[in-house]
């Protein structure tokens, strides 16, 4: 079995591709040394903790998870052979034919190793990966993972959880692309970083719309440096991206040396769209897409699957789920406490689903009474508590090493996802989990990417910065007042109902429990039309209902955990979303 065979990086595709997903040998030991024997087979890229892996064991802090398989290099000769990992949780070392080729730290980000020098030329090469994951015992980003799952925290998962693949590339190859569209100027600037070991290279870029070449240009690249090409989009090919019209331009970028010798070619895409905040016709501040007010109406999405935890069963399952979200009338997903594989964002790009992207929370063990329970009860008092040095210990960022790790993770997140047009807002902190110096985080984000909105602190511990006045409200009457930032209800709802006939929770968790589909539907309609809709005229401009699917014990999803059923009446949900859109269109005039 070879799961998830699709090319894993749609925004930087090559023709050379060898997928290494499938059965690997594995062992869990107390040592970093290569094990004397193997415990069995694991199905990569599924974590050993999940059913889909075929293992069903939890990696404990201090243990090592070892992977091994043999592989043949991609077809062809010469050039370089690159080994790519979509994500490995948390820290790993990689050997090829007994030689260390590198490693990585950080459970949510891709990395690439050049393994050319370690290949033996026989067609049978040994690949060994050793992993440690100190879930709950470090400051690293971990999201909702815990070794004691329950309530709003879920089972830990470790090791390889995204696709592993090989590519054969030329000696002078493109290592990364930075693609920056400019909606107002109607341009796209392409920056390519190349390996360029043989001297300066020329860059070229071609833009196509519907298969028609609409722009092309050349640039130059000093050896090993960034080369840049800016292309202009003519008026007749100006197709802005939005949830209603998610148009994507095709982009091809290559390197050459001299007149004709081609070194490398990669395929990508981009969109022309612009995010801002501006007053509507009544002077109320709104989120704007392409200079027009937009109601962002969506769901909290935590990205867990019953058989694969972080890893979906198939690419088709991902596309089907996102299409169902769009068909219900939503246009937004808040990706909560997780970074998805690149193909998830690609499908959002194609379908026109806006994504608000959380930075994955980390820090030391949380004082939940301080950051969650007490704050929920005393929200008016706690909302503006300063996140300065005296509180860093209480907010789980007491050590400088922890704060430095967050800064690195933040930069890695922006760099990894900025290529996706669907990402409309960065969320550096959620409910104070691992929060410190939110104002500094906003500055760091804008230095890396000033084309998107920033929700400085989702929920509370608001420092007054960013673009969003961000509310979480599960317990109180909803009252919105005009603010100097645009108002978002970035979490609310969460009505639980464990639907009969589906995997039952160990203990039902949610924010109020319905007893039937009819009651769940009625409560959803009452909340949306009776409490939320009247606040639109007062400035409410984004909605994030909790949540898309059930997750473990948290059975407050619109869909069941197995994605086989929608829990409220689907027609009622569509009708509610249509009513919200109609009311918003009325109140902004």
Locations of the language-model features?
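Secreted/periplasmic carbohydrate-active enzymes, especially glycoside hydrolases
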Residues: 1-347, 351-355, 424-425, 441-447, ...
